């Protein structure tokens, strides 16, 4: 009996897991014996290095990034956030009287019919479903009626999928720029040495808030009804850097974007750069619904617009772009340096400064084709039969998988639900050129000094005496 207890104690001791890597001596010995039996070396007892080899070659899943979303058990916080959108917000209590503080009148805002949009997408077999569409509409209503935010308009942009959690993105426009501070901002990234790559290209300024790529502000949350976070304005450097990398989102705004070339910011900045690119390429509207005001440059809605039939909405000619094109500079409006008086415009400006992109209200049929002469948009229908009277039609983007637009009657919408990865081949950048050891301009001369002539033999003899 004592022998059995001693064996059990020995096994228990060998099965104790290390706090560093989580392995045990028992598991290591099992792998070591399996390695020796598999290779069958001649002098197995002399190969003491096999133990170290087995330990070094063992795969550790903790060291690599997950390839699939990590299942997260729902907690009480997500449940409370989901329940909160179905009721009125809780009012603060006045400590003097013990009564709730009177609520401010709700803010007036503009928004699309999100329930009708969810029904259109549900008919086309895309989107997030009608049940989640109700929650999205209630969350957008909560944002729009908040008197502290004081938004002028709110629109559900879409949902970005992440490895640990997802992002629900709402596109808002504030009545006053100062009201933007009411929404908590995403934490600023920590500056890492060597993050900014040296480049001889001129620095491109950031577009002002309310213009170009920063015309709208984006609020994100991991669960509908949860706390909102305001994404920072996008910079041209971030847009250009995001075009050179492919990275899955983690669902954590403060995560470091570890890529080559280095991205100037954290995941909040990377998500904002993706939104700017996707918005410029996939936010569309039915043709003839808007007209461009030549004086103000803004879009005006037509009052006498007649929606086409459902299946006709599945044609690229039935949709137009309503967001300005994002140029190679990372801006919607090309920035040009000040031209010297004696300089030639064609020789002084580079290709990015001379770029001319498509104008507003350009039809989707004019979009660049994919390799193999494949169209950038493919049609989708609510029914394969043309005999069905009331149908919904739309288009699915092949450039940005997950971006769709659709309409049925007077109801239309466009939304993005995807991983934030563009359908384009990944072309890694070559390493940068070898840096110079020092600046040649600071060197006084590049010529070596001549060796002084040796003294005459007579002078050497006198010196010896």
From Swiss-Prot:
GO CC annotations, alphabetized: motile cilium; radial spoke; radial spoke head
Entries under InterPro entries matching the protein: Radial_spoke (IPR006802)
Family named by the database record: Belongs to the flagellar radial spoke RSP4/6 family.
Gene this protein is translated from: RSP4
Chain positions covered by the region annotation Disordered: 184-209, 445-465
One Pfam family matching this protein: Radial_spoke
Keywords in alphabetical order: Cell projection, Cilium, Cilium biogenesis/degradation, Cytoplasm, Cytoskeleton, Flagellum
Record-given protein name: Flagellar radial spoke protein 4
Main location (coarse class): cytoplasm
Subunit record text: The radial spoke head is made of five different polypeptides (RSP1, RSP4, RSP6, RSP9, and RSP10).
Source domain of life: Eukaryota
